[in-house]
Structures are given as C-alpha cells and as structure tokens.
Amino acid sequence: MAVSGATVDEVISGYEALLGDGAHGVVVRDVISVTGPDAGRYLQGQLSQDVVAMAADQAWSFLLAPTGRVVAWLRVHRIGADEYLLEVDAGWGMAVRSRLDRFLLRTDAVISEPRRTALIQRRWNPTLVRFGDEVPVGSSVAAPVGPGVAGLDALLVDVSDEAGSEARRDAVPEASLERYRIAHGIPAMGTELTEDTIPGEAGSWVIDTSVSFTKGCYTGQELVARIDSRGNNVPHPIRILSLA
C-alpha cells in the first residue's frame, strides 16, 4: 500500500527517523515578498507579531481580518531593513496578498505575487545535541516551533538548482512530516486553522509564539486582546476519526 507515492513502511520509517537521530523532509510553501521603505512599518500594523523588535530575523505571526479571525498563520523572514518575506502553507499565498493589498494606502511598499518555494524541515530528538547542520547557501534558516519539537527549517530563498536538488536527497516522505506535525499539535491552514478560526482556538503556545501584547495596534487586535484578558479560555476544536 502506498501513501502519496511512498509505502506505509516508508512513511513509518521516516517518521521514526524524525523522532530519533534525525532526518529531513521537503515541503512546498507559498512566499510573498514585501519590499520598500515602508515595508516594516506597514507589516507592523498588519501582523500580530512585533516585526520591528523581532529578536531573530524570523518569527511566526497571525494575519487577521478586521473581525479578528484568522486569514493566515505565517512566518516572517526579515531579509533586510526594507525587505521581508512571508512564508505560509501552500495554497494560502493569494489570501495573504489580497488581505495585505486591502489596506495598502499611501504606503511606499510593494507586495509581490506568491511564489512556490521549497522548505527543508530537519527534525531530531530534543534530547540530542546537534552542531554543524549544513544548509544550502541562500537559505533563510529558522528554528521550528511546537511542543517537543527540535530541529531547523531552511527556506530555499535564493538557492541554486544543484544545491536545491542536493538538499532534497534522502528526504523522508512528505507524509512522514505530516504525521510528525499532527503528533506535535502544530496547526496548519485549511485543517486546524480556517477563516472561521479565532487565534485563541489554536492553543496557548501558538499565541505565545505568534502574538505580541506590547506592540502598538494592528488589524484584528481587539478580539485577541479581549480573549487574552479573559484568560484565553476558548473552546478548542478537535477532530474525531472513526474506524468503524
């Protein structure tokens, strides 16, 4: 039996490697660039993350509708003072672009069309100490998020075809990565997160990772702040699988 081109045994073996000594897989992401002198200021008013004060050059954030519901959960990459990349699950790039275009008034910034970009995801047992993991030159490297998750992510932003092909060698099946994602409670757009989701439903660790409560105002902030002031006590949707 095969799962998306891989056998069940290959998927299980890949998943066990991700949990153990380490392995890597490849997923496709949508990437939108925001460039220009006002890029950082504009994103600061649109994203839940404090883009200006990011401790590293990458951070997770919500992009919200004015109602406070989720448009996208994405990762921000700061490439330079006037250049940012927004990385989101494949198929959601246009929703991000359309939402950002909506309030782009008298702002010196340009929002690109989404483009498909490979993301190398390396995972290993969190009890292991790893050094010297190489990534292709031209990658934007970030630490992954999620309870019990250890590894690194490399977004192949400006990578040669040869280096990209080399990075894909010996990759575990994408289904192994998906199993890992679900097992660690990491939400994805279109499944756990939809246009009807409010951020609090994603879980407290996602809020802690993606929302700044000390920055200035941003679109959709009111609902997030109100729920936080009430202890973030919101129902969390679950999915029940029946094998009958």
Where are these regions (language model features)?
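Basic, glycine/lysine-rich polyanion-binding surfaces/domains
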Residues: 1-244
